[in-house]
UniProtKB/Swiss-Prot annotation:
Residue numbers binding ATP: 29-32, 86-90, 414, 499
EC number: 5.6.1.7
GO MF annotation list: ATP binding; ATP-dependent protein folding chaperone; isomerase activity; unfolded protein binding
Descriptive protein name: Chaperonin GroEL 1
Keyword Cytoplasm: yes
PANTHER family according to UniProt: 60 KDA HEAT SHOCK PROTEIN, MITOCHONDRIAL
Family the UniProt entry places it in: Belongs to the chaperonin (HSP60) family.
Keyword annotations of the record: ATP-binding, Chaperone, Cytoplasm, Isomerase, Nucleotide-binding
UniProt subunit comment: Forms a cylinder of 14 subunits composed of two heptameric rings stacked back-to-back. Interacts with the co-chaperonin GroES.
Cell location: Cytoplasm
Enzymatic reactions: ATP + H2O + a folded polypeptide = ADP + phosphate + an unfolded polypeptide
Task performed by this protein: Together with its co-chaperonin GroES, plays an essential role in assisting protein folding. The GroEL-GroES system forms a nano-cage that allows encapsulation of the non-native substrate proteins and provides a physical environment optimized to promote and accelerate protein folding.
């Protein structure tokens, strides 16, 4: 297929147009005084959002060369969202500022490759300074503040702080669309998996159709149990201990084995519950091992040379309670060794860091949460469909920001962390004039988020930046900044206006990366449009008279 190619000034102008178009749409959403963006669809109501990455994903320009600029800038937002889950608008604002100023210097004859080297040197110094500013997240109040700032909704902030209090920082939080108009949440204590009882005859509470067994022995196997002879040795061993509570987690239980369990349950000889093992294939084996570690049991598997009739009481797990309905089973407070559980959690976290699959990462995080004993479901409600989608996106942003803050700590919000990082550029060693130019552009770009926050709040951006610097010197306090909600200059840390350090760092790194790519691009290649074909006209049908 034929291609079209443009070079030099023409290529840079097309890229700049695409970058500016996307940035203008995205940066209006920055901060609590940012505007919403409505996105039309071919059918149904338009989506309304305040989320930078959602806006960025919607932008596709008609001109293919300009669209390249928009797509490159979109990368800064998308990568920031993938790593930190928030800060996408900040990344876009930073990247546009660097590209805008950098293209002027490239057009004036600066060498873009040396210029990029200067940007990279500056980035390293700035990232180190941001990490120095970071303070470890300590209190519930700080978690609430981070979530409130990200979602721009105190109710969401309070809800997430409450949930984090109850499930811990490793807990899994699932966000669903609710049926009402309010925010609600459910907590699931212990390890839950999506398999219920095999037979309704195991139910102990007929009004709720639940089977609840306190302090049972737990037999864990990846085998299908059909023959009663496989089960008899372990049933006799359990009864010999003086207890009759037994939970069986197996691939399946049917035939004589199931009939024996049900009959003994109904007679009161044995208080049994049989549930299917969770997951499939290798994931099932891993989850059964998780259950074994949590309960202090052993997985009885022929893969390791163990047959079911060789199981002893010492191989069985224990838990304070096991609760099962037709769809789910929950193991509460397993009696497993705490050190073994923590070692398993560390192992899973290492796998999370190395995996490249988003699906695998999500499943591993769920397993960590289940071992940690915390799963929460947030049900987001709103009066209308567009409002529901917009609110759900804000809850997701707030959750991601909270996790990022727990991971790397917090810094002053309102663009101040970036402003305070600027002096770090004074110590960067440069060899060429273009490197010094790059550092000057970084100095200007780092002011841009604060400037844009002020503009969105109806203030003069440059005046606000100068006033913040003056007040920081007067009060000898680097945390002084501009509160866009009140229009006052305050100590942002005391006022609870804080950002996760990971979000600020990731936004800066991705902005510098994308700016470097755009500034060093000198030719653009895209598919040439196909010429319109004049198709043969379809002859009209002759009119007939009836």
């Amino acid at each position: 297929m034929a291609k079209q190619v443009i070079f030099n000034e023409q290529a840079r102008a097309a890229l700049k147009h695409g970058v500016d178009t996307l940035a203008l749409a995205v940066k209006t959403t920055l901060g609590p005084r940012g505007r919403n963006v409505a996105m039309g669809k071919k059918w149904g109501a338009p989506s309304v959002t305040h989320d930078g990455v959602t806006v960025a994903k919607e932008v596709e320009l008609k001109d293919p060369f300009q669209n390249m600029g928009a797509q490159l800038l979109k990368e800064a937002a998308s990568k920031t969202n993938d790593v930190a889950g928030d800060g996408t608008t900040t990344a876009t604002v930073l990247a546009q500022a660097m590209i805008d100023e950098g293209l002027k210097l490239v057009a004036a004859g600066a060498n873009p490759m040396i210029f990029k080297r200067g940007l990279d040197k500056g980035r390293e110094a700035l990232v180190a300074r941001i990490k120095e500013q970071s303070i470890t997240l300590k209190s519930r109040d700080e978690i609430r503040q981070v979530a409130t700032i990200s979602a721009q909704d105190p109710e969401i902030g309070e809800l997430l702080a409450t949930i984090m209090d109850k499930i811990g920082h490793d807990g899994v939080v699932t966000i669903e669309e609710g049926k009402g108009t309010t925010l609600e949440y459910e907590l699931v204590e212990g390890m839950q998996f999506d398999r219920g009882y095999i037979s309704p005859y195991f139910v102990t509470d007929s009004s709720r159709m639940e089977a609840v067994i306190d302090e049972p022995y737990i037999l864990i196997t990846d085998k299908k149990i059909s023959a009663v002879n496989d089960l008899l040795p372990i049933l006799e061993a359990v009864l010999a201990t003086g207890k009759k509570d037994l939970v069986i987690i197996a691939e399946d239980v049917d035939g004589e084995a199931l009939a024996t369990l049900v009959v003994n349950k109904m007679r009161g000889t044995l208080n049994a519950l049989a549930v299917k093992a969770p997951g499939f294939g290798d994931r099932r084996k891993a989850m059964l091992q998780d259950i074994a570690i949590l309960t202090g049991g052993t997985v009885i598997s022929e893969e390791v040379g163990r047959k079911l009739d060789s199981a002893k009481v010492q191989d069985l797990g224990r838990a304070r309670r096991v609760k099962s309905d037709k769809d789910n089973t929950v193991i509460v407070e397993g009696f497993g060794d705490k050190q073994a559980i923590q070692a398993r959690i560390r192992q899973l976290k290492q796998q999370i860091e190395t995996t490249t699959s988003d699906y695998d990462r999500e499943k591993l995080q769920e397993r960590v949460a289940k071992l940690s004993g915390g799963v929460a479901v947030i049900k987001v409600g709103a009066p209308t469909e567009p409002a529901l989608k917009e609110r759900k996106a804000r809850v997701e942003d707030a959750l991601n920001a909270t996790r990022a803050a727990v991971e790397e700590g917090i810094v002053p919000g309102g663009g101040i962390a970036l402003l305070n990082a600027i002096p770090a550029l004074d110590n960067v060693q440069t060899q060429f004039e273009e490197e010094r130019m790059a550092l000057n552009i970084l100095r200007r770009a780092l002011e841009e988020p604060l400037r844009q926050l002020a503009i969105n709040a109806g203030e003069d951006g440059s005046v606000v930046v100068n006033q913040v610097r003056t007040l920081q010197r007067e009060h000898n306090n680097p945390n002084y900044g501009f509160d866009v909600m009140t229009g006052k200059y305050v100590d942002l840390m005391q006022a609870g206006i804080i950002d996760p350090a990971k979000v600020v760092r990731t936004a800066l790194e991705n902005a510098v990366s994308v700016a470097g790519i755009v500034l060093t691009t000198d030719a653009l290649i895209t598919d040439a449009p196909e010429p319109k074909k004049n198709g043969a006209r379809t002859p009209s049908m002759p009119e007939e008279e009836f």
